[in-house]
Amino acid sequence: ESLMECHYKGGKDLLSLYYRENPSTSLFKGKHLIASGSLNSFTGNKKTIIGDLSAIIMQHLPWWCEWRRSPRGIGKLTSKDWNEKLNYICHTSSRDDIHLIAGVPSWILMIIKRIIDQNNVNNIHEVWPNFELFLHGGTSINSYLPLFQELFGKPINYYQNYNATEGY
């Protein structure tokens, strides 16, 4: 419980800092695409869940996060089958008004490329014109930054966040 509380507080702090630095933001008028890892049931005890920390946190998001998240629901989003997850995210989120994206750069890169291809557009702002913030962590974004700048189509804000267990 304290782990979850700590991560949710970190998320609230990050969004509060963003809002303070960008008071005219429309971040909270749209949806937030959050990419997570996968979950598994422990065969020794079905009540025990094992998996990536991002998936465990997303499974227990508070209501004030859940109603902004795209896509909604948890099943396919935490699937071990990356292709199933990727297809679901891209198909569902393409229709939403995404303002924020959060996740590991390599995962987000695949999602963005797929959505651009599926919608036959030049950049992601043709699909999500209000996209303004990319929250990233898990690995350094430096090697991905030129790709994202090209795929996004216009400047956005980047906020880096690392758990105590992560580094680069």
What kind of region is each of these model predictions?
Residues E1-Y168:
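Active-site phosphate/ATP/adenylate-binding loop shared across adenylate-forming ligases
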